[in-house]
């Protein structure tokens, strides 16, 4: 038996030596050989292979088991193409206000995403589960016409602005001037008004296999907004399986600005399956309570002892139907969380036990809106003909605090000429 064990040990050492030599060579080859000799590889693909080779060599150096090394090497592959059903580009060819709409497909890591220039919307996002099976985890429609003439949720997957969330009574006073905005939500302004950034065609300044840069100018006077707001927004799928959003905005007149993205997720990949079994963690010890119309009172209250507290990961459905004034006002979860910490950091994690999919949310913002899909009613169908059910999609929107322009004690959202608004958000996917 001792001889057999010795032979197995020698075999393991040989296998590890071979694997180490191979991946060390691959790392050397990828980093040394000029990229011009391999034009079929994108920058993102080179970066991804560098990252994976470094990870694999590190695992070998730490004498990880060979199956771990093999699993890491297999992660170089994305979802099999026969697992992904891409939407038709033709179905997203349209025209709004004289501007053509189009559909774009991005790849990065194990992710595949499709976005349309109408509202800079995320239309689909494919990600693998713990067994490597891919599913579309983003709720959306199958054509641009359905987004233009939506019969359900207007904001699916869209860029939101000039100010995301609600402004009380659609009005504010800045520098002595009163501004009145359109009242599109129970006597208040929601997500910019009737014609926010979600209802316009964005220009595409550049696009490649893994990234797209959108550009828009929201004109002064549009629905009462005072300044020309110029926005650049980049979507990137990274080699380490993140959907990253980078915002940059300027204005020629002082105005509040708070941009966000309104993607809806179901990590099971099914728009008719409840998200109440998803488990959620949010790094926030306070919230801004709201009234029956979801307008902040101006207070900042502790989450200690509240069913809104997600500082310990728990199933979304555990407390959602508790008797609580805030849950009653929101019809479930639909609240701003005052994020702990500052700078670019992880602020939330969403886990779906059945598939093993895990989504970590990173941002440099001070707020996160958690919405549990309380207003979906199953009457509208998604891109696959599946009813979008009640509490079957979740939104985690990084943001400034709602109605901040009307609450001096909230973090400032005013952007002035000469200043630059920036905002980073990333949804990073993995499994466990």
Name these PLM-found stretches.
Residues 2-10:
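Extreme N-terminal basic, low-complexity initiation segments
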Residues 8, 27, 35-36:
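Basic polycationic patches enriched in arginine
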Residues 13-16, 23, 29, 41, ...:
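Short hydrophobic targeting helices and cationic amphipathic motifs
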Residues 24, 31, 48-55, 60:
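Short, positively charged and aromatic/hydrophobic N-terminal segments
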Residues 62-67:
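Bacterial N-terminal signal peptides that target proteins for export
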Residues 69-77:
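Bacterial N-terminal signal peptides
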Residues 80-432:
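An exposed, glycine/acidic-rich loop-and-rim segment of catalytic or binding clefts
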């Amino acid at each position: 038996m001792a001889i057999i064990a010795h032979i197995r040990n020698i075999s393991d050492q040989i296998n590890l030596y071979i694997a180490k030599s191979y991946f060390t060579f691959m790392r050397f080859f990828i980093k040394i050989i000029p990229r011009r000799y391999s034009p079929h590889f994108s920058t993102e693909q080179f970066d991804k292979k560098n990252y994976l080779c470094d990870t694999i060599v590190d695992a070998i150096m730490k004498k990880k088991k060979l199956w771990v090394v093999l699993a890491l090497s297999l992660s170089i592959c994305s979802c099999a193409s026969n697992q992904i059903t891409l939407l038709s580009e033709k179905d997203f060819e349209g025209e709004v206000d004289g501007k053509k709409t189009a559909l774009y497909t991005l790849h990065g890591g194990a992710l595949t995403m499709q976005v349309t220039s109408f509202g800079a919307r995320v239309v689909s996002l494919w990600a693998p589960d713990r067994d490597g099976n891919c599913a579309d985890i983003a709720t959306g429609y199958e054509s641009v016409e359905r987004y233009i003439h939506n019969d359900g949720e207007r904001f699916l997957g869209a860029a939101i602005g000039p100010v995301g969330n609600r402004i009380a009574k659609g009005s504010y006073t800045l520098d002595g001037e009163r501004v009145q905005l359109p009242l599109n939500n129970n006597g208040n302004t929601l997500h910019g008004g009737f014609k926010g950034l979600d209802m316009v065609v964005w220009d595409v300044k550049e696009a490649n296999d893994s990234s797209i840069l959108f550009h828009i100018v929201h004109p002064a006077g549009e629905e009462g907004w005072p300044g020309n707001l110029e926005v650049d927004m980049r979507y990137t799928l990274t080699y380490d399986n993140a959907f990253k959003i980078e915002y940059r905005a300027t204005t020629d007149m002082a105005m509040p600005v708070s941009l966000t993205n309104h993607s809806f997720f179901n990590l099971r990949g099914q728009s008719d399956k409840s998200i109440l079994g998803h488990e959620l963690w949010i790094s926030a010890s306070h919230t801004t309570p709201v009234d029956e119309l979801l307008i902040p009172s101006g207070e900042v209250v502790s989450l200690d002892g509240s069913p809104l507290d997600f500082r310990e990961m728990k199933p979304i459905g555990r407390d959602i139907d508790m008797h609580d004034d805030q849950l009653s006002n929101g019809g479930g979860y639909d609240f701003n969380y005052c994020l702990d910490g500052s700078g670019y950091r992880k602020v939330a994690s969403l886990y779906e036990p059945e598939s093993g999919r895990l989504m970590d949310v990173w941002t440099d913002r001070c707020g996160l809106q958690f919405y549990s899909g309380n207003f979906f009613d199953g009457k509208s169908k998604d891109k696959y003909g599946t009813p979008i059910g009640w509490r079957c999609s979740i939104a985690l929107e990084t943001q400034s605090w709602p109605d901040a322009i009307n609450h001096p004690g909230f973090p400032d959202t005013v952007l002035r000429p000469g200043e630059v608004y920036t905002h980073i958000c990333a949804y990073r996917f993995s499994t466990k």
